[in-house]
UniProtKB/Swiss-Prot annotation:
Glycans are attached at residues 37, 70, 114, 127, 134, 142, 157, 184, 195, 227, 230, 261, 267, 278, 289, 299, 355, 361, 388, 398, 401, 438, 453, 456, 601, 610, 626. This is Envelope glycoprotein gp160. Residues 691-851 are cytoplasmic. A lipid is attached at C763 (S-palmitoyl cysteine). Keywords: AIDS, Apoptosis, Clathrin-mediated endocytosis of virus by host, Cleavage on pair of basic residues, Disulfide bond, Fusion of virus membrane with host endosomal membrane, Fusion of virus membrane with host membrane, Glycoprotein, Host cell membrane, Host endosome, Host membrane, Host-virus interaction, Inhibition of host innate immune response by virus, Inhibition of host tetherin by virus, Lipoprotein, Membrane, Palmitate, Signal, Transmembrane, Transmembrane helix, Viral attachment to host cell, Viral envelope protein, Viral immunoevasion, Viral penetration into host cytoplasm, Virion, Virus endocytosis by host, Virus entry into host cell. Residues 387-410 are annotated as: V4. Residues 294-327 are annotated as: V3. Specific enzymatic cleavages in vivo yield mature proteins. Envelope glycoproteins are synthesized as an inactive precursor that is heavily N-glycosylated and processed likely by host cell furin in the Golgi to yield the mature SU and TM proteins. The cleavage site between SU and TM requires the minimal sequence [KR]-X-[KR]-R. Palmitoylation of the transmembrane protein and of Env polyprotein (prior to its proteolytic cleavage) is essential for their association with host cell membrane lipid rafts. Palmitoylation is therefore required for envelope trafficking to classical lipid rafts, but not for viral replication.
Length: 851
């Protein structure tokens, strides 16, 4: 019995201690390296701010540090706000720079057209000689297989400067740009697409200058980059993550089939593959030096002719029957590069087709697609080239039995299908003079189609894929430096103390360096981290504000002006939001803020030594709204308590006791009590009145004669005085007015006594009826009291037993230590005596030796 009682006592003690000590409360931390995905506007930075499209970008000085994070993060090049912004911004710059001309010439009028002589295309031989930069046909523009463009001469009538007269005009058109009633391109013709365009503004010739810029995150936000070499556009668990404030430089070249002058080329071939379908973007190995050179021979003139006031028509005299003929040739080890693409595809984890590279073929899109899909479409100094890549594909696939070569015939078009939005733009005819442009081929846009036995790499016209390759390994995050975690400390009442010591600012990304550290280690440096965070945000805001001030006159020119303002506003909103949130919780100017709000889930606790703050944030994200609401309610209650406490403190001043405003509340309480008593008396009176009515009595305010019949009050009849007149004297029928109120008061007292007596008897009867229940409750309370006494006795006995055990332990320890000390002292004495006896022993030994 005794051991069981001791075990019960120990269990009770442990349980009580756990209930007291293990209670956890919500603690707010500020300056924690945690984040969530964001989708806010980015702004640009560039080295070349002289071009029209980048004049409002921040100056780039290459001082953008990257910090390695020991975290795991998900990346997706297609579901990515960074790439989506790049696609939209490049499209806007492209549209604004090129300025499509929607004032068609010669509008929608009937034209009489005839095919010019000698415009048939020259047939190409079955085999074509491979050319390079030293080939003579390049300079002479007569390489084998380059035919002439089909041209039709048209004339039409239209009013000119003289509105009442019509004038005849002549013009040369490509046969593919007109629709005629005869199949051979003659007869009555109309310009193709003339009824699908809208007249809105005039246009001039512009160059599409290649612009390189980088995106930067606004203050309070950051960019993460997947640094894994095996990253293929979709990676749910990238373990090599770095944090940066800006992206790498990106190229704004637009084209189909190929990507030119990209910044992602490496000494290897790798593939970005869409997570849900067969869309890919293939980065080519820069080791093979793949280039493309395009040329449009010159000696052509474009002469504007005025049709009428404010409207111009551009005529194209034909000199060499090739007004829009251009061509491109490819240099580098293309055959080996394409072979490496096939080998890389066969090893890709997403690929499920044949591993035989001989059955993996490059193919062009099917017939019937838009020209931008059927042909390779690119921009060369503001002109749009459409190149037939059949010869080129036969060459890289080594199809010697078909026409093949390393160059492709191209033509320039005015009617262009837009690449980002559905629509058609019409541009001015080609400018005069020779056009040349050189580009480095860095990627291939393709769709992978596999049926198990054969795989086709079909070239694609998805221009947007180019920017997914450029920036697909980045993601934008919003830094959330205010997380919650449970701790055993509870808030104590004290005034918040501001830290006044300065800290060295490492930049906005400095505090993210601890993102991979354990929660306990990261929380130890909160003071420096939070101040670094705030200082970095303020610094970035100031830089943006300076740029906006310098360029406020040009904000309307490009998309960057608006994005800079948006970034500035976003940064201020985030900073104010964080500070307002901390203030609403009563945690302003605190890095670690303990609260009185209990932790909602005791089973959900962090591993301070092994868990990062980012991992903890993902686990408790669903509790954020409830905890935030509880913290706000606790702070409101705390403010109410402080207000009441401050009001009580006002009584410490002796002069406040004589302040009438301090007593108004208590005076009000007294008035309320008096009014309540009066109301109670009125209620009792009404109850008694109703009670008398039920028993057949007349109301107490009936006439005196009727009332005196029930309560007989006899009075003596008074004699009139001698001086009274006849009018003053009279018979009052024996009634006196003054005795009646006294008897009535006695009557009310009697009724009140009976009422109270009745209430007392009723309550006593009710209690007597509930005596069994009271006895049962009394017995239960007695049993509980006995049980508590028993447990208290157990607890007292256990405490006495523990105290006795401690006293016995203390006695034993004291005796043991005393014995050990005595033994140690005796041993030290013996050693000392032995040391002191050494000279004597030596002397005695010497004496014996001498004897």
């Amino acid at each position: 019995m005794e051991p069981g009682r001791n075990q019960l006592l120990v269990a009770i003690l442990l349980t009580s201690a756990c209930l007291i000590y293990c209670k956890q409360y919500v603690t707010v931390f500020y300056g924690i390296p945690a984040w969530r995905n964001a989708s806010i506007p980015l702004f640009c930075a560039t080295k070349n701010r002289d071009t029209w499209g980048t004049i409002q970008c921040l100056p780039d000085n290459d001082d953008y540090q990257e910090i390695t994070l020991n975290v795991t993060e998900a990346f997706d090049a297609w579901d990515n706000t960074v790439t989506e912004q790049a696609i939209e911004d490049v499209w806007r710059l492209f549209e604004t720079s090129i300025k499509p001309c929607v004032k068609l010439t010669p509008l929608c009028v009937a034209m009489n057209c005839n095919i010019t002589s000698g415009t048939t295309a020259t047939p190409s031989p079955p085999n074509i000689t491979i050319i390079d930069e030293n080939s003579t046909c390049i300079g002479d523009n007569n390489c084998t297989g380059l035919g002439k463009e089909e041209v039709v001469e048209c004339e039409f009538n239209m009013t000119g400067l003289e509105q009442d007269k019509k004038r005849k005009y002549n013009d040369a058109w490509y046969s593919r740009d007109v629709v005629c009633d005869k199949t051979n391109g003659t007869g009555t013709c109309y310009m193709r697409h003339c009824n699908t365009s809208v007249i809105k503004e005039s246009c001039d010739k512009h160059y599409w200058d290649a612009m390189k810029f980088r995106y930067c995150a606004p203050p309070g936000f950051a960019l993460l980059r997947c640094n894994d070499t095996n990253y293929s556009g979709f990676e749910p668990k990238c373990s090599k993550v770095v944090a940066a404030s800006c992206t790498r430089m990106m190229e704004t070249q637009t084209s189909t089939w190929f990507g030119f002058n990209g910044t992602r080329a490496e000494n290897r071939t790798y593939i970005y593959w869409h997570g849900k379908d067969n869309r890919t973007i293939i980065s080519l190995n820069k080791y093979y030096n793949l280039t493309m050179h395009c040329k449009r021979p010159g000696n052509k003139t474009v002469v504007p002719i005025t049709l009428m006031s404010g409207r111009r028509f551009h005529s194209r005299p034909v000199y060499n029957k090739k007004p829009g003929q251009a061509w491109c040739w490819f240099q580098g080890n293309w055959i080996e590069a394409m072979r490496e693409v096939k080998q890389t595809l066969a090893k890709h984890p997403r690929y499920g087709g044949t591993n035989d590279t001989g059955k993996i073929n490059f193919t062009k899109p099917g017939i019937g697609s838009d020209p931008e899909v059927t042909y390779m479409w690119t921009n060369c100094r503001g002109e749009f080239l459409y190149c037939n890549m059949t010869w080129f594909l036969n060459w890289v696939e080594n199809k010697t039995n078909q026409t093949h070569g390393n160059y492709a015939p191209c033509h320039i078009r005015q009617i262009i299908n837009t690449w980002h939005k559905v629509g058609t733009n019409v541009y001015l005819p080609p400018r005069e003079g020779e056009l040349t442009c050189n580009s480095t081929v860095t990627s291939i846009i393709a769709n992978i189609d596999s049926d198990g036995n054969q795989t086709n790499i079909t070239f694609s016209a998805e221009v947007a894929e180019l920017y997914r390759l450029e920036l697909g390994d980045y993601k934008l995050i919003e830094v959330t430096p205010i997380p919650f975690a449970p701790t055993k400390e509870k808030r104590y009442s004290s005034a918040p103390v501001r830290n006044k010591r300065g800290v060295f600012v490492l930049g906005f990304l400095g505090f993210l360096a601890t993102a991979g550290s354990a929660m306990g280690g990261a929380s130890l440096t909160l003071s420096a981290q939070s101040r670094t965070l705030l200082a970095g945000i303020v610094q970035q805001q100031q830089q943006l504000l300076d740029v906006v001030k310098r360029q406020q006159e040009m904000l309307r020119l490009t998309v960057w002006g608006t994005k800079n303002l948006q970034a500035r506003v976003t940064a201020i909103e985030k900073y104010l939001k964080d500070q307002a949130q901390l203030n609403s919780w009563g945690c302003a100017f605190r890095q670690v803020c303990h609260t009185t709000v209990p932790w909602v889930n005791d089973s959900l606790t962090p591993d301070w030594n092994n868990m990062t703050w980012q991992e903890w944030e993902k686990r408790v994200h669903y509790l954020e709204a409830n905890i935030s609401q509880s913290l706000e309610q606790a702070q409101i209650q705390q403010e109410k308590n402080m207000y009441e406490l401050q009001k009580l403190n006002s009584w410490d001043v002796f002069g406040n006791w004589f302040d009438l405003t301090s007593w108004i509340k208590y005076i009000q309480y007294g008035v309320y009590i008096v009014v309540g008593i009066i109301g109670l008396r009125i209620a009792i009176y009404i109850v008694q009145l109703l009670s008398r009515l039920r028993k057949g009595y007349r109301p107490v305010f009936s006439s005196p004669p009727g009332y005196l019949q029930q309560i007989h009050i006899h009075t003596d009849r008074g004699q009139p005085a001698n001086e009274e007149t006849e009018e003053d004297a009279g018979d009052d029928s024996g009634f006196g007015l003054w005795p009646w109120p006294l008897n009535y008061i006695q009557f009310l007292i009697h009724l009140l006594t009976r009422l109270l007596t009745g209430l007392y008897n009723s309550c006593r009867g009710l209690l007597s009826k509930n005596s069994p229940t009271r006895r049962l409750i009394s017995q239960s309370l007695t049993a509980i009291r006995d049980w508590l006494r028993l447990k208290a006795a157990y607890l007292q006995y256990g405490c006495e037993w523990i105290q006795e055990a401690f006293r016995a332990f203390a006695r034993t320890a004291r005796e043991t230590i005393a014995g050990a000390w005595r033994g140690l002292c005796e041993a030290a004495q013996r050693i000392g005596r032995g040391i002191l006896a050494v000279p004597r022993r030596i002397r005695q030994g010497a004496e014996i030796a001498l004897l």
